[in-house]
């Protein structure tokens, strides 16, 4: 597909707009056909391979087991090395940590009689089945597996509904378990009812408990999922169970599993039903879901998958939906594996957040009341892993689909309005989980508006965020949930306002890390203030963004200064650069670099550009000069986790952009691949995959809340990004595994020697032509005045 675009003269910092046009080459292969959903299903990626749509409410995917009934094989429900499947659940989250989440209402075909309760099948020895990857197929919007019990399973999805086929073998019982209580981390209530006359099963499960085992206050339920399942074959029998009791001919069941330690439900608890069919039956089932009501689940199903729909038809619709979404970026060149890795990363980006409103516009709010989307929205969204996705995910989503970005922003504002004015940092369905640190909703909204998402109540959201950043609440002063799930939106805000840093003893998950996160949040808030015309607020929050300097100890080590914990009295506790004391999922050596909006200021505190370069070189390399990109110890980068993802781009500020090109390509080539272990750690609802997409395009949104793009080098010879403001054409005809260094760049036909692009590229589009070579041109982009901008504290 090609579209006209407006070209912008970037060479003069886009001061003059030039009219123009270009036509993108059609992609040689269907983007959806190149997706490999099994990427990330091992190595801690925690992705799932099942059927879903872009941002879909339903994700129908297998639940694997490693022989423990109350534990999923991996968060996300699927582990490539786990040899058994115990069900196919209707909901999943991709790339999470902890013990998992969602995994609601598993359906499981079994070819034996149901003689004991599935809830006491402690080792998944009776009602699970082995499978082999040779009998498995996954594609965008479709999943199929032939189980060792002889049943062939096919799954496909619409936005709020899905369809499955269970082809049972001849000569064996044909039973289908509906394990309604068995969400991945348990449930507090479950109900299910069989109507044999209409061949329908309906029910609901009440769950939540994401990372609840880390804080007792969060071991709770906060959503209910309703489902309606309509079958095309008559039921020959039915039954139910509750805990250890089995009821032959039962048509109802009630009872959740409850919650237990370590994030998993207790053994021996739960409820569900089963239905039987004639031996050898080919059974089709259409399922609608809703987080509001059974009536809405039924309406969602009827609207999306009418009774005459076939599974091949739904599979094709899902394929087309993914093609349309993925085709927002067209690439040409590279290897087949590189193209598959790229489009699978973009696929993972578009899995979350998720549509949470029904076809009638209703959704369950954080106050557990039913609400309706407002006039600006097309949908309400849920599942916001803020600490992760504010870094580069929401920028990409919004640039490609500005209405989705706008709806996410409005959804977050609605959540805050329904949550006593608090913007939670990690939301799951209709609940606040408080997981991680900082105040990521602020940069999230600033990211969205910077990349083209404008259809939300910016004035109202800004006022709400300012209040949260300036008025200390009881939750901000509470230790509930700490360390990992501190309940305050701005933990220890009183210290921030009084000390101008978060102290070593606080109501936060690490004073130093919280200080850096709050500094980024306040910088983003200054950007929102600029957008709404609040000059005083812009100056106030830009000044506060500079508070990170109060935790820089120039005498931390004989080798140089570090950002570290600081006591409330101003003294410095004992310190070593490998410590994680005061930080979140990273060491002081990693967090030293996390000042993305004021990199020049950081370099100055380190003693100047040359000293910063020396420390960056040591950060990315072992003593022998080899790369240290992950698992090299706490003194080095961890490019498998968020605190390090911006660091390879810092060489652009240091006058050595060729080192950014080199480091980013090393990560792309060695840590990412077209294989189950092809994501280096938790994908975190698509955040890490978004980093890969940006890096493969040769650019990155370093500064929270702004649309400047730092430059690396393109992986592909040709790419077209159909962005919110216009098409961006990226040509690098010499791109190859060897030719990774930028020797020259033209923008809209004019020579360009800066290793970054101003916001006008995102806002209006443009044409980039890279000259790449196997050897670096160490002069290109190296001049001091060519470096990307920094934003120091405001001074009158």
Describe the residue ranges of each PLM region.
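Sec/Tat signal peptide C-region and signal peptidase I cleavage site
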Residues: 20-24
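Bacterial N-terminal signal peptides
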Residues: 9-18
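ATP-dependent phospho-/nucleotidyl transfer catalytic cores
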Residues: 521
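Bacterial N-terminal signal peptides that target proteins for export
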Residues: 1-10
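Accessory carbohydrate-recognition regions in carbohydrate-active enzymes
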Residues: 25-443, 449-516, 529-550, 556, ...
């Amino acid at each position: 597909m090609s579209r006209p675009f407006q070209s912008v003269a970037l060479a003069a910092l886009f001061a003059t707009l030039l009219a123009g046009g270009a036509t993108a080459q059609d992609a040689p292969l269907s983007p959806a056909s190149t997706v490999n959903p099994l990427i990330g299903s091992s190595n801690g990626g925690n992705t799932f391979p099942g059927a879903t749509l872009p941002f879909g409410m339903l994700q129908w995917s297998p639940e694997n087991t490693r022989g423990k009934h109350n534990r999923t094989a991996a968060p996300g429900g699927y582990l490539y090395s786990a040899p058994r499947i115990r069900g196919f659940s209707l909901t999943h989250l991709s790339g999470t940590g902890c013990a998992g989440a969602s995994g609601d209402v598993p359906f499981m075909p079994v070819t034996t009689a149901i003689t004991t309760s599935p809830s006491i099948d402690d080792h998944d020895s009776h009602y699970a089945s082995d499978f082999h990857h040779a009998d498995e197929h996954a594609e965008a919007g479709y999943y199929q597996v032939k189980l060792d019990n002889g049943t062939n399973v096919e799954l496909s999805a619409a936005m709020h509904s899905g369809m499955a086929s269970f082809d049972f073998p001849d000569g064996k019982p044909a039973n289908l378990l509906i394990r309604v209580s068995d969400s991945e981390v348990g449930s507090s209530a479950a109900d299910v009812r069989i109507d044999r006359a209409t061949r329908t099963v309906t029910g609901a499960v009440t769950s939540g408990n994401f990372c609840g085992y880390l804080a007792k206050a969060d071991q709770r339920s906060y959503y209910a999922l309703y489902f309606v399942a309509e079958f095309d074959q008559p039921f020959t029998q039915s039954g139910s169970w509750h805990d250890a009791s089995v009821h032959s001919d039962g048509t109802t069941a009630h009872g959740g599993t409850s919650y237990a330690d370590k994030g998993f439900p207790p053994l021996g608890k739960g409820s569900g039903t089963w239905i039987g069919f004639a031996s050898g039956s080919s059974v089709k089932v259409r399922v609608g879901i809703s987080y509001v009501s059974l009536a809405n689940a039924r309406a969602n199903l009827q609207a999306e998958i009418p009774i005459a729909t076939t599974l091949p038809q739904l599979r094709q619709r899902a394929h087309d939906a993914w093609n349309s979404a993925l085709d927002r970026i067209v690439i040409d060149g590279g290897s087949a594996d590189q193209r598959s890795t790229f489009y699978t990363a973009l696929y993972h980006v578009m899995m979350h957040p998720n549509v949470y409103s029904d076809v009638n516009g209703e959704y369950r709010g954080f106050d557990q009341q039913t609400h309706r989307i407002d006039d600006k929205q097309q949908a309400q969204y849920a599942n916001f892993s803020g600490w992760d996705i504010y870094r580069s995910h929401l920028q990409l989503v919004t640039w490609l689909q500005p209405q989705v970005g706008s709806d996410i922003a409005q959804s977050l504002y609605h959540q805050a309005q329904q949550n006593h004015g608090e913007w939670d940092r990690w939301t799951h369905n209709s609940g606040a989980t408080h997981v991680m640190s900082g105040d990521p909703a602020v940069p999230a909204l600033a990211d969205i508006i910077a990349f083209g998402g404008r259809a939300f109540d910016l004035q109202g959201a800004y006022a709400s965020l300012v209040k949260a950043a300036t008025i200390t609440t009881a939750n901000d002063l509470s230790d509930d949930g700490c360390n990992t799930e501190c309940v305050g939106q701005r933990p220890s805000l009183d210290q921030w306002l009084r000390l101008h840093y978060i102290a070593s003893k606080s109501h936060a998950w690490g004073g130093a890390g919280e200080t850096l996160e709050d500094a980024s949040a306040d910088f983003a808030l200054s950007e929102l203030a600029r957008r709404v015309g609040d000059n005083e607020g812009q100056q106030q929050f830009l000044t506060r963004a500079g508070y990170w300097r109060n935790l820089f100890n120039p005498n931390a080590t004989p080798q140089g200064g570090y950002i570290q914990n600081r006591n409330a009295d101003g003294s410095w506790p004992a310190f070593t650069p490998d410590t994680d004391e005061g930080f979140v999922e990273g060491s002081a050596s990693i967090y030293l670099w996390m000042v993305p909006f004021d990199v020049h200021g950081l370099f100055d505190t380190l003693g100047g550009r040359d000293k910063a370069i020396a420390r960056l070189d040591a950060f990315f390399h072992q003593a022998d000069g080899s790369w240290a990109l992950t698992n090299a110890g706490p003194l080095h980068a961890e490019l498998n986790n968020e605190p390090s993802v911006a660091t390879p781009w810092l060489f652009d500020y240091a006058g050595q952009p060729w080192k950014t090109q080199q480091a980013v390509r090393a990560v792309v080539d060695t840590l990412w691949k077209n294989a189950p272990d092809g994501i280096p750690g938790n994908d975190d609802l698509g955040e890490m995959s978004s980093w890969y997409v940006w890096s493969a395009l040769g650019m990155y949104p370093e500064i929270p809340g702004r649309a400047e793009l730092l430059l690396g080098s393109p992986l592909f010879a040709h790419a077209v990004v159909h962005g919110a403001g216009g098409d961006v054409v990226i040509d690098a005809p010499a791109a190859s595994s060897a030719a990774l260094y930028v020797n020259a760049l033209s923008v809209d036909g004019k020579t360009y020697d800066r290793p970054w692009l101003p916001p006008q590229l995102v806002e209006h589009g443009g044409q980039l032509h890279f000259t790449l070579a196997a050897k670096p041109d160490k002069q290109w982009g190296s001049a001091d005045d060519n470096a990307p901008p920094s934003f120091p504290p405001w001074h009158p």
